[in-house]
Amino acid sequence: MTEPSRTLVPESIHRDECVSLLGAAALARVVISVKCLPVALPARIALIEGNFVLLASSDPAVILAAERGDVVSLQIDGLDADGLTWSVMASGIAKRATGQSPPNEIMRQAFDRGATFVLLPLSVVVGQRG
């Protein structure tokens, strides 16, 4: 006799844990609209004061979105020790960061290579595990 298949039901991740996962991440997908189509682009990230994410990107579309004050989302995902996957998405109105010094070595390297910093407030933060 075969075992019945186990169906995983995704569970929501509390905002505080989502922010913690964002704080531990160094890389994310920045999700923007380019000519009315969704685009996901890689960017280095750093959590600032638990309320903002600083993105480092050299992509002109990301920089333009920040200069226009577009709604931008970022997404990270991972795998727990027990094999469950998780995903966190944060969204807010982006703005180009001026006068922001690189908060860590990874961001400093991006800045030295010509990346522009974009500040994203954590207006909406959602996550799920499953």
Would you name each region that the model predicts?
Residues 1-22:
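Extreme N-terminal tail/first-helix region
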Residues 23-27, 68-69:
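A short, compositionally biased
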Residues 25-58, 74:
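Short beta-strand segments
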Residues 34, 76-78, 121-124:
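Short, structured patches in soluble enzyme cores that scaffold and shape functional sites
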Residues 51-52, 71, 93, 124:
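Structural motif
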Residues 56-61, 122-124:
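Secondary-structure transition/turn motif
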Residues 58-116:
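Short, structured beta-strand-loop surface elements
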Residues 116-130:
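Charged phosphate-binding loop/patch that engages nucleotide di/tri-phosphates or the phosphate backbone
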